[in-house]
Amino acid sequence: MRILASALGLVLMTGCPSTSVYRTADPIEPGSYQVGGATSIGGISDEAQETRSATGQTELMLRYGVIENLDLGLKLFVPGVEVNATYRVHRGNLWSWALLPSLSWVRSKESSATVDAINAFASLGGVASRPLGDKWHIGFGVYSGYGLYWPETGGRGHGVWVGSFALADYQLRDRWHLTPELSMYKVVSGQVPVTGGAMQTGIALRVDL
């Protein structure tokens, strides 16, 4: 419990975005909804401070199918919000491909390690997925993002990161999905969200309404 509390406390203090995906290249059906929740644990490496810290995140998510190849999503996570989309660009006999754009906003609180600040992030990813039998799907993807940091004390920071992820989606009964995922990213320019990188593993439970 102490480890989990410390991890959640770190996420609350820092302005890290949610980099999880928890979905394949196939959007949900037009006119339908999907809700779910997820939890993850991982680590952040801060090269400037030469430190490594544990982290964790809890998420709630909602998706709506707009048209055959597009759905829109809303994600609430500690301590921010994200809007995203799944746009399928190819549907093959085995593999499907989709683009994954997102915008997120995070508010970090003042503490001994951080200041009161607003963080904004934009990301574009891609995922390729395919079925494995009747109940399993697997997916692999990459993404890149840009972040801005506005502290209350003045000034501005920014950063560019690249990352990758792998996931498996298991259909429980007719409407339920269990989705484990492994993801990682590296900041290649600037210092937002951290001068370094992070890795996390998590699991999501989603239901089609």
Roles of regions detected by a PLM:
Residues 12-38, 48-50, 134:
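Outer-membrane beta-barrel biogenesis signature
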